[in-house]
Amino acid sequence: ESDYNQTYQDMGDILTECYSGETEAGETFIYAANDDGTFCSVLVIDQDDNYVSFVGEGTFDEENGTVTITDEVSEMALTFGVAVNDDDTLTLDMGDLGSATVEEATLAVAVQGLKYAVENGTEMN
């Protein structure tokens, strides 16, 4: 547990932005990143506490307006389009996987979300 606590502390020190909201299916969706995108995380938790996480380097494709996060452990990647809405929320479009509407949140949301998922959830990826 102390290793995880250090990880959460490190995340809090690294992250500079966090967005939280819901997918179309009602799942919790949390996106967080540091200034230059070298560390990004996406966490999706469903109503049954099953979760999928992507933690690793993020790249932004300006031409297509997409962000891709490649998970450091699984090497799986998640790509989503980013659209800014009139009410300052963001819509993250993941194609066949659906979309999520998120708003700016405190960094604690990202850290607490990951902590909750690790301690209570079932990893799905």
Identify the role of each PLM range.
Residues 61, 86-87:
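Long, low-complexity, Gly/Thr
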